[in-house]
A protein has these predicted regions:
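N-terminally biased helix-coil "hinge/interface" segments that flank
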Residues: 1-585
Length: 585
């Protein structure tokens, strides 16, 4: 049996899947659970989900647990993450002014050239002054990024060593070279910045999961979904939490692929997961998820994190509705649950309840205080500019139904506009899916696939505005947890060969040795070695393996090439292990 859990900003969802075929390849959904996420007590939320699922299973039968979460993505979208100081070593030839995205920034004078040679050492006094400035502001998080650090991490390591020697009180530190082997200084510093910004959120998440599993004596393989739809063991997440920052949106996309016929029918479609805090937008092209091999974007900044194409709009069922300067504003903040459930602010969920769109939903029926929802909207309307919102008044009195309808129309318009902007941005550009590069392909979706709490209410309204067919994903309220559960277990192998130093590293296998006499490699052979070791470590010679990163450069001494340094990362290709019974074929 497999458990999938998605920890969202509003709800924590869970599913229990069991094998339903003699060959062990088919799965069925045995139990589901959905509870409110308690951000100040994540362990309790996870335990509540586990207890419902374990009521339908025996602990020894659980062979794998896969988690996803939108917690980190939400704090980035809401710009509610911890402040981060940036230590940048950009070298010459680059104006760094547009790169100063830290809450405090240090620009250092040392640099590494494109061959990996340290041309200029750091100036310690310059560094110490900058660190003191960051410390004085009470910033506890630091990202250290040097240009060409993948070819020589020495300057980044030197900064870290000084921080430790001087006992600076930084709690979370990221080094740029540890997060990706690919070049791209601007993308690397953004990656390191956000990696540091979400460390405390992820640490709380990992600790809550570990404690919950210990409480229920679950001793099994535990994984977290990555941005690319692959998985990483829970105990390795903190090495690079940025790799899982979009695990929530990835789970939604994998769940859509698992529970609908989009892949089998080779449909071009928009996938929506309308949550309480955000709406996650994904894209399928001819049945396959769109992919960003160069790196996803976070708040408009490009990173080096490979991932499924998605965009998180800070707009959900529990987004705070407010009036500013007489104008209605929805999100990006979320104050808590809807007013109908005791929350402090009106939300789109309150508007849906007033319109009777979700009154019969089992998750709301009997629990929602409709009067509280109405009162919250009425109180809000008093601050509106009547000249701009005239449709909401009849004979000088507020038409509450019309006002609630206006709120939902505004929410839908934001989602539709974002979808249209996404499609416009991809016009006349090469687009990748998880399998191939597509050039000259027109992206004209005709299908809208929705999941999330209000999916059944909003899907037909959105489809009408877009001119698409629409389909609510089966098990829409927990389909993201299904996507996490059914994600193919992946592992990766990093092989680094330094022919100048005559050394071979197969990192995850723990092999670090001198090259043997006559042993030599070119880049293609290093790739073959990485793929072979990935299959060996997975104990599956038929596993589909892909190269996720490759890097090769000459080692120069005395104006002469004396060897090469090559680094390759291979991984089992992300995908689904099965499609569950009850999905659309």
């Amino acid at each position: 049996m497999i458990i999938g859990i998605d920890v969202g900003g509003t709800h924590t969802d869970g599913v229990l899947l069991g094998i339903n075929s003699p060959n062990g390849e088919g799965y069925e959904i045995l139990a589901t659970s959905k509870v409110r996420t308690q951000k100040d007590n994540l362990m309790k939320s996870i335990l509540e989900v586990l207890d419902v699922l374990l009521a339908a299973a025996q602990v020894p039968d659980i062979k794998r647990i896969v988690l996803s979460t939108t917690l980190a993505a939400n704090v980035i979208v809401e710009e509610n993450y911890d402040p981060v100081g940036l230590v940048l070593i950009p070298g010459p030839g680059l104006n760094p002014e547009h790169l100063l995205i830290g809450d405090e920034n240090i620009l250092l004078s040392g640099y590494i050239n494109h061959r990996g040679i340290e041309v200029r050492d750091l100036e310690q006094e310059e560094l110490l002054k900058g660190l003191e400035r960051i410390k004085a502001r009470g910033i506890k998080n630091l990202a250290i990024v040097s240009k060409f650090s993948t070819r020589n991490p020495g300057l980044e390591a030197e900064v870290l060593q000084l921080i430790r020697e001087k006992d600076y009180p930084f709690e979370n530190i990221s080094l740029g070279h540890q997060l990706s082997g690919r070049l791209g200084f601007p993308r690397r510093l953004v990656t390191a910045y956000f990696n540091t910004a979400i460390m405390s959120v992820y640490r709380d998440f990992v600790q809550a999961v570990e404690k919950a599993l210990e409480e229920r004596e679950l001793d099994t393989g535990v994984f977290v979904l990555k941005c690319d739809g692959g998985t990483v063991p829970l105990d390795r997440v903190m090495e690079a939490p940025i790799e899982t920052v979009n695990s929530g949106p990835a789970a939604s996309i994998m769940g859509t692929m698992a529970m609908t016929g989009v892949y089998q029918n080779k449909e071009t479609a928009i996938a929506l997961d309308i949550g309480g805090t955000t709406t996650d937008i994904g894209l399928f092209i001819k049945g396959e998820p769109a992919f960003m091999p160069e790196g996803i974007e976070l708040n408009g900044f490009p990173t080096l994190v490979r991932g499924l194409y998605s965009l998180s709009l800070p707009l959900g069922g529990d987004s705070k509705i407010a009036v500013k300067d007489g104008k209605l504003k929805i999100g990006p903040e979320r104050d808590g649950p809807a007013a109908a459930f005791g929350g402090p602010s009106p939300t789109p969920t309150d508007a849906l309840l007033v319109l009777d769109y979700i009154q019969d939903d089992p998750d709301y029926e009997g629990r929602a205080d409709l009067q509280a929802a109405r009162e919250a909207l009425v109180a809000l309307a008093g601050d509106l500019d009547p000249t701009e919102y005239g449709r909401c008044w009849q004979d000088g009195k507020l038409d509450l139904t019309e006002f609630a309808s206006f709120i939902i129309d505004k929410m839908l318009a934001s989602i539709v506009e974002t979808i249209q902007e996404i499609l416009a941005s991809l016009e006349n550009k090469p687009v990748y899916t998880i399998s191939e590069l597509l050039a000259g392909v027109e992206i004209r979706p005709q299908l809208l696939l929705t999941m999330g709490g209000p999916a059944s209410a909003l899907s037909p309204l959105l489809a009408e505005k877009l001119g698409y067919r629409e389909e609510v994903v089966p098990y829409a309220k927990v389909a993201n947890a299904v996507g996490a559960a059914l994600a193919r277990p992946t592992l990766q192998t990093t092989v680094r060969v330094d022919t100048a130093a005559s050394y071979l590293h197969i990192v995850e296998a723990g092999i670090h040795r001198q090259l043997k006499a006559g042993e030599d490699y070119d880049l293609e052979e290093v790739e073959e070695l990485a793929m072979a070791w990935t299959r060996k470590r997975a104990d599956d010679e038929t596993a589909v393996v892909e190269i996720s990163e490759r890097e090769s450069f000459n080692v120069i001494r005395g104006f002469r090439t004396i060897g090469k340094i090559m680094e390759v990362r291979a991984q089992i290709k992300p995908g689904l292990i099965s499609r569950p019974e009850g999905s659309e074929n």
